[in-house]
């Protein structure tokens, strides 16, 4: 039996196989997964909001369980407005866990009715990060096996020097 709704927020700059792994595992557990492409004022994304949303759409196609949304404010406010009580985060290592525990405590303070769940990333993707992918691309390195195959050229094209 599946559960209700969950939100999976992130910058997804770019969308990786680690993100996809967590997303599909959430879709196996929940009836509805909102993947939230965040507007993060503390980061300067390589890809625009629309590019990031389109990347995810290209990978998942039409999927009744997964809805791609954009949040420019607090995720807890979006959760309240849409009656979402669970926020999910992927955890690669203890550094992620430390950061995410602090964030979950703050989110709980802002929205006491919510809970945060943590999914360990599959060991194949424990080292994958959007930052690492961008660093590899700066030196024209291969990103196959790090991002969905259908996105490799789209992502690489952003880094080709003109």
Curated annotation (Swiss-Prot):
Recorded family membership? Belongs to the bacterial CoaD family.
Task: Note the InterPro entries from the entry.
Answer: Cyt_trans-like (IPR004821), PPAT (IPR001980), Rossmann-like_a/b/a_fold (IPR014729)
Please give the name of this protein: Phosphopantetheine adenylyltransferase
GO molecular function list: ATP binding; pantetheine-phosphate adenylyltransferase activity
Which cofactors are named for this entry?
Mg(2+)
Q: Where in the cell is it found?
A: Cytoplasm
Q: Which lineage ranks, top first, belong to the organism behind this chain?
A: Bacteria, Pseudomonadati, Spirochaetota, Spirochaetia, Brachyspirales
What's one GO BP annotation on this UniProt entry? coenzyme A biosynthetic process
Q: Which organism is it from?
A: Brachyspira hyodysenteriae (strain ATCC 49526 / WA1)
- Output the HAMAP family linked to this UniProt entry: PPAT_bact (MF_00151)
Give the record's pathway.
Cofactor biosynthesis; coenzyme A biosynthesis; CoA from (R)-pantothenate: step 4/5
Alphabetical keyword list:
ATP-binding, Coenzyme A biosynthesis, Cytoplasm, Magnesium, Nucleotide-binding, Nucleotidyltransferase, Transferase
Name the domain of life. Answer: Bacteria
Q: Which Pfam families match?
A: CTP_transf_like
NCBIfam families under this entry?
coaD_prev_kdtB (TIGR01510), cyt_tran_rel (TIGR00125)
Q: What does this protein do?
A: Reversibly transfers an adenylyl group from ATP to 4'-phosphopantetheine, yielding dephospho-CoA (dPCoA) and pyrophosphate.
Q: Which GO terms describe its cellular component?
A: cytoplasm
Q: How does it assemble?
A: Homohexamer.
Q: Where does substrate bind?
A: 11, 43, 75, 89
Catalysed reaction(s) here are:
(R)-4'-phosphopantetheine + ATP + H(+) = 3'-dephospho-CoA + diphosphate
Q: What Enzyme Commission number(s) appear in the record?
A: 2.7.7.3
User: Where is the site labelled Transition state stabilizer?
Assistant: 19
Q: Which residues bind ATP?
A: 11-12, 19, 90-92, 100, 125-131
